[in-house]
């Protein structure tokens, strides 16, 4: 566990640690000279060590430790790094802003990861609805061999790891397998930028860009904030009135989680805070499944959510496994489109939980 500032522990309450600030140990160690450091002097082993020491994890939502993801097993042959700049959930623009303002750092970060992986090819995948980011990335990549920009159709959930690999390379990750099994590694743009800062500037991961938006945010904005910053601080910065806020969501409206505490802290995985005037979690009355198949059509993984829901109700773990419930990426498309208003995503989550627990 690491903190974004130096101080002494005051108390632990509600799964949060309160720290009394006593200085900033990071300042002297960070190279704060202006300009991008293009020359990569670190060896592959040194790169992975620096990533580990900096506490870098996947910042797109999964939070998987980056040094583990970068240290590919000897029996896996990786030939492509995909930098994930797909930000397909409504309201969120943190990655977009980062690509516009830190484009060259991201490109050098991709080159650093290429060196650590022992490969030559990196593709930065960006939604077609991000023209400013596309323009600046394309302009700068002309000076870098082995890094290319690929513009993707804007659709949800294009940014999911396995779906992005198939869209970019045409390779399909089999059920139960990992991206490395088809020769790919996917890293979020925020993670790649953090890799650059760790390796080239000796900067640990103690801050990130966070979108604060929604109809209860008077001035929606993106902020670079320290990990551990209370949500209430950012809410005040967008002139949000706590008395008018009916729902706070950490992340996006499709895959985010509700926050019950206005002082909940920003974490390494907090891409956004959404503020809504009404409680948008209102659930219409559930009716009987009519076997329309819309959930099957909407599922990007090709699952049958209606059948999974039925087996979860029956507690049939064997059938759940046969229906590949563990492949569910929890995008929520099935529940969103269901005309019977069945909480299919909840059933899929419960099925995954029960199946893992039964092992």
Regions found by a protein language model. Give the residues of each.
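Conserved mixed alpha/beta catalytic, RNA-binding, or beta-rich assembly cores of soluble enzyme
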Residues: 40, 44, 51-64, 74-106, ...
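Fe-S ferredoxin-like electron-transfer domains
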Residues: 13-66
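Short acidic, glycine/serine/threonine-rich loops at helix termini
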Residues: 30-33, 62-63, 69-70, 92-96, ...
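Ferredoxin-type iron-sulfur electron-transfer modules in oxidoreductases and energy-metabolism complexes
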Residues: 270-283, 296, 300-359
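Hydrophobic alpha-helical positions that pack around
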Residues: 119-231, 237-242, 252
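Single conserved hydrophobic/aromatic residue that forms the stacking wall/gate
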Residues: 2-7, 12
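Polyanionic/metal-chelating signatures
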Residues: 110
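Short, ordered loop/turn segments at secondary-structure junctions
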Residues: 24-26, 86, 96, 126-129, ...
């Amino acid at each position: 566990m690491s903190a974004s500032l130096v101080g002494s522990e005051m108390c632990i309450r509600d799964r949060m640690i309160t720290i009394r600030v006593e200085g900033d140990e990071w300042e002297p160690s960070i190279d704060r000279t202006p300009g991008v450091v293009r020359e990569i002097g670190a060896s592959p082993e040194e790169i992975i060590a620096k990533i580990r020491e900096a506490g870098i994890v996947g910042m797109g939502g999964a939070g998987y430790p980056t040094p583990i993801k970068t240290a590919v097993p000897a029996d896996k042959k990786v030939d492509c790094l995909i930098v994930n700049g797909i930000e397909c959930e409504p309201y969120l623009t943190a990655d977009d802003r980062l690509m516009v303002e830190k484009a060259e750092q991201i490109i050098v970060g991709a080159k650093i990861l290429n060196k650590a992986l022992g490969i030559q090819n990196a593709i930065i995948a960006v939604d077609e609805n991000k023209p400013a980011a596309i323009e600046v990335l394309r302009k700068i990549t002309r000076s870098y061999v082995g890094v290319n920009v690929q513009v993707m159709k804007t659709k949800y959930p294009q940014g999911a790891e396995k779906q992005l690999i198939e869209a970019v390379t045409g390779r399909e990750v089999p059920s139960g397998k990992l991206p490395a099994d088809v020769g790919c590694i996917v890293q979020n743009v925020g993670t790649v930028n953090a890799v650059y800062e760790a390796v080239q500037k000796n900067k640990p991961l103690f801050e990130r860009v966070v979108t604060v938006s929604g109809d209860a945010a008077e001035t929606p904005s993106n902020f670079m904030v320290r990990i551990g910053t209370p949500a209430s601080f950012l809410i005040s910065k967008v002139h949000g009135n706590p008395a008018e806020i009916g729902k706070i969501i950490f992340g996006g409206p499709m895959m985010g989680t509700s926050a019950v505490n206005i002082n909940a802290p920003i974490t390494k995985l907090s891409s956004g805070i959404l503020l809504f005037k009404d409680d948008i979690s209102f659930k219409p009355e559930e009716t009987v499944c009519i076997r329309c198949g819309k959930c099957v059509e909407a599922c990007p993984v090709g699952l049958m959510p209606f059948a999974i829901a039925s087996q979860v109700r029956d507690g049939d773990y064997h059938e759940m496994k046969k229906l590949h419930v563990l492949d569910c990426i929890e995008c929520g498309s099935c529940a969103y489109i269901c005309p019977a208003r069945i909480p299919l995503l909840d059933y899929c989550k419960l099925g995954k939980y029960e199946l893992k627990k039964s092992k």
